Amino acid sequence: MIEAEENTLALPRTLVLVGLMGAGKTCIGRRLAQMAGVPFVDADVEIERAAKRTIAEIFATYGESEFRALERRVMARLLAGRTCVLATGGGAFMAEDTRALIRLHGLSLWLRADLDLLVARTAGRTHRPLLNNGDAREKLAELMAKRHPVYAEADIVFDALDESQDASALRVRSCLLSYLADHAETAP
């Protein structure tokens, strides 16, 4: 469990977590939001609310391009709102206009995880449309090759490990505090 003195984090603006599925955006994001005393928002949940359909249904009915267009609109709305910890879908940061919005209104943090960890964390999950057809390991490797160069544009790069969620959250907090100190950002 996280100790009380380690349970604080002042965010000057929305913290946007990016990375592949299984990197820990949701689990770590919830703990960071608790530390910062701000809401945790899962962009995928907000997309499902806006569409009144699951992500899998959106993909199946409308295809990936329509999903990405909806994702961009929802991200713009969320970034214009109050400060929060925002977990994005794995592909959200790939869109240049979304990255520009994040640069303007948020602080991006890439949760970088190795292939074995991603495979272990996503095994048997059926709510991930991009992994439902074919070999998940191969698909994740392809996504890593395509997305990692773009994810590297994030303000902060954090290496996710196979450790407890509390341990990861504390390490992310340490990275954030160092980044904020180095960049002289303070909470409003």
Curated annotation (Swiss-Prot):
Residues annotated for substrate binding in this entry: 44, 68, 90, 147
Broadest EC class assigned to this enzyme: transferase
GO biological process, one term: chorismate biosynthetic process
A UniProt-annotated Pfam family: SKI
Listed pathway(s): Metabolic intermediate biosynthesis; chorismate biosynthesis; chorismate from D-erythrose 4-phosphate and phosphoenolpyruvate: step 5/7
Keywords: Amino-acid biosynthesis, Aromatic amino acid biosynthesis, ATP-binding, Cytoplasm, Kinase, Magnesium, Metal-binding, Nucleotide-binding, Transferase
Source domain of life: Bacteria
PANTHER family: SHIKIMATE KINASE, SHIKIMATE KINASE 1, CHLOROPLASTIC
The protein's assembly and partners: Monomer.
Protein name: Shikimate kinase
Organism: Rhodospirillum rubrum (strain ATCC 11170 / ATH 1.1.1 / DSM 467 / LMG 4362 / NCIMB 8255 / S1)
